[in-house]
From Swiss-Prot:
This is Putative ankyrin repeat-containing protein TP_0502. Keywords: ANK repeat, Repeat. Disulfide bonds: none annotated. InterPro entries: Ankyrin_rpt, Ankyrin_rpt-contain_sf, Dendritic_Spine_Reg/Scaffold.
Length: 298
């Protein structure tokens, strides 16, 4: 983030302190005295060259800036190039500016440091997105949701990280309403599931088809590794699907003693009944399995 600071002599005494504040917020600052800009005849330092690589143009005036042709020129150039134009409102004259009000951000002395902190964070995020999108295109992955979903199912962690850096959400669902985390679990992509969780995928997000959470998907296929990972990430073991079943019921149905113990240790409720009126305890009794009954507290 490169800030070009234009100031008049009335505010020259403040420049060093303001530059120090902006540098502390991660901004590269280049100050220019307005009075000298128009007198500089060096061929390598034309007025346009001063803002060539700038992302923000920041004005610091002791008087009403609309009287200054430099303000009109540089703010116009900045707006035309899509740059942010900032003006520190230090006097009543400056605060009362009406022309360009829709194009210029008026900052207060008490809050401009916070503005640049937030702005720098936003700039870094946007730059990260641009870099990631360029990298995706260079590797042959146009930035479409379908491509993101396909790479999740393929287990391509490097490309998925680029999609996430490019602004795609770890909470995205496919066309059928299945969250990408659940897709990774269904496809047996354990490392992908771990990465999505680390990047903020909601662990209790439900699929639209059967209202299963990722933990229920893991329980259905007996994936203890992912089940443990999800539980450690705070997954609710008592989420119920459209049929009323829980991850514990599914684990009992598989007679998976290790998974049952894992779920019980994380607060799974063995009394919750499905739409058939059977709970995990009920199924354990139905199977007439003493070990299952013991595990679920019968």
């Amino acid at each position: 983030m490169k800030v070009v600071l234009f100031y008049d002599q009335g505010r020259a005494h403040s420049v060093a302190a303001i530059c120090e504040v902006l540098c502390a917020q991660g901004c590269a600052v280049t100050p220019h005295a307005i009075e000298q800009v128009w007198n500089d005849t060096s061929p390598c330092s034309t007025p346009l060259a001063l803002v060539q690589d700038a992302t923000h143009v920041f004005f610091l005036y002791a008087h009403e800036p609309m009287r200054d042709p430099a303000f009109i020129f540089f703010s116009g150039v900045a707006c035309g190039r899509g740059m942010h134009v900032l003006l520190l409102a230090t006097t009543t004259e400056v605060r009362d500016i009406h022309v360009f009000r829709d194009l210029v951000f008026l900052l207060e002395e008490e809050t401009f440091e916070d503005f640049f902190r937030v702005e720098h964070e936003r700039f870094v995020r946007q730059k990260k997105k641009r870099v990631a999108r360029t990298a995706l295109l260079e590797r042959g992955y146009p930035c479409f949701e379908e491509n993101f979903i396909a790479t999740v199912m393929d287990g391509n962690i490097d490309i998925v990280n680029l999609f996430l850096d490019a602004g795609f959400s770890a909470a995205l669902k496919d066309a059928r309403g299945t969250p990408v985390l659940s897709l990774a679990v269904r496809e047996g992509q354990d490392e992908m599931a771990a990465q999505l969780i680390a990047r903020g995928a909601p662990v209790d997000q439900l699929s639209d088809d059967r209202a299963y959470s990722a933990l229920m998907e893991a329980a259905q296929i007996g994936n203890r590794t992912v089940a443990r990972l999800l539980l450690h990430a705070g997954a609710d073991p008592n989420v119920r699907g459209s049929n009323g079943q829980t991850a514990l019921v599914l684990a009992v149905g598989r007679k998976d003693h290790v998974l049952i113990r894992l779920l019980m240790d994380h607060g799974a409720n063995p009394y919750l009944e499905d739409k058939l009126g059977l709970s995990a305890q009920g199924y354990a009794k139905l199977f007439n399995d003493p070990t299952l009954c013991t595990l679920v507290g019968v």
